[in-house]
Amino acid sequence: MSPVQLAEKNYERDEQFTKALHGESYKKTGLSALIAKSKDAASVAAEGYFKHWDGGISKDDEEKRLNDYSQLTHHYYNLVTDFYEYGWGSSFHFSRYYKGEAFRQATARHEHFLAHKMNLNENMKVLDVGCGVGGPGREITRFTDCEIVGLNNNDYQIERANHYAKKYHLDHKLSYVKGDFMQMDFEPESFDAVYAIEATVHAPVLEGVYSEIYKVLKPGGVFGVYEWVMTDKYDETNEEHRKIAYGIEVGDGIPKMYSRKVAEQALKNVGFEIEYQKDLADVDDEIPWYYPLSGDLKFCQTFGDYLTVFRTSRIGRFITTESVGLMEKIGLAPKGSKQVTHALEDAAVNLVEGGRQKLFTPMMLYVVRKPLEKKD
């Protein structure tokens, strides 16, 4: 594979497109936000995303997606952010689950666990790489009282993150910056710690984003990441395995899924020292991490859990898809909205299957450190 070409930094273009597409919809939530979009701009976003996904899994197809990583991810989150918040909440990640623990509680605990493993505290300035709409950052700053800067290449998500920070009176602790995590604009050695929660999977090359994180970390600084990877059981030459990986890629805006070994080696190659690593999806939990997608209502703990899991279950996703299709047909939802829900359905099916076969994990946890002194 030839070297990946870094994206052009055209933040003014992105901002103008965001305003044209989303307008004031960042103040709304769920399907009401979807209805408020510009129909023409949404069609452009859908076309820009789905042009990469026609079933092609050749090296040439893959290389095109890798080289367009920035716009691919930008268009993806322009299309799916409202669906994510409607179905899942404001923390766009999976978690481990225990009996007696509600869905929201498990989400917070998963975030707390990362902060605990990293030893984050109130004296730290921390970078959240790929911060989404700020759900994890809000929880972690409440838990540790640290200052967090969120990095995101999607202007709409930044608008929503700022909206929530002000709403919950956390804007003195939280700030958000537009940027490409493959070419960060921060000064070198400007953060005490960096974390990424299921975000660096969008990088075309893991070594690229990890090297940028290494650069902005102070010597002795810690980096913690929940990484999406294919496990050691995954076989790239196995047609069924590759189909599962492709389904995850197309439905989640990922240029290419990499293996655990690739992620680990990438961390080492840029200079990190691995202090802790564990696949938290492979610990024989009674309740699987993918249960909200598989629709196993028996694991729900609260009434709110039943609502969440129903929305994210196969039946709930079917209802959402058909409802959105009807809204699109009568002109309420932008053209391409139903295609987006179909892609999310493909992702859900393959995430569950990848989890059941232990081919995929969304929570390969690495806690690594930048050495105090450079190695010769």
Swiss-Prot record:
GO biological process: ergosterol biosynthetic process; methylation; zymosterol metabolic process
Pathway: Steroid metabolism; ergosterol biosynthesis; ergosterol from zymosterol: step 1/5
Key word Lipid biosynthesis present: yes
Name of the top EC class for this enzyme: transferase
This protein's GO CC annotations: endoplasmic reticulum; plasma membrane
Activity modulation: Substrate analogs 25-azalanosterol and 24(R,S),25-epiminolanosterol act as inhibitors.
InterPro entries: Erg6_SMT_methyltransf, Methyltransf_11, MeTrfase_SMT, SAM-dependent_MTases_sf, Sterol_MeTrfase_C
Induction: Expression is induced in the presence of fluconazole and up-regulated in azole-resistant strain. Expression is positively regulated by the transcription regulator HAP43. Expression is also induced by N-acetyl-D-glucosamine. Expression is repressed during spider biofilm formation.
Entry EC number(s): 2.1.1.41
Function summary: Sterol 24-C-methyltransferase; part of the third module of ergosterol biosynthesis pathway that includes the late steps of the pathway. The third module or late pathway involves the ergosterol synthesis itself through consecutive reactions that mainly occur in the endoplasmic reticulum (ER) membrane. Firstly, the squalene synthase ERG9 catalyzes the condensation of 2 farnesyl pyrophosphate moieties to form squalene, which is the precursor of all steroids.
Protein name, entry field: Sterol 24-C-methyltransferase
Organism, scientific name: Candida albicans (strain SC5314 / ATCC MYA-2876) (Yeast)
Gene: ERG6
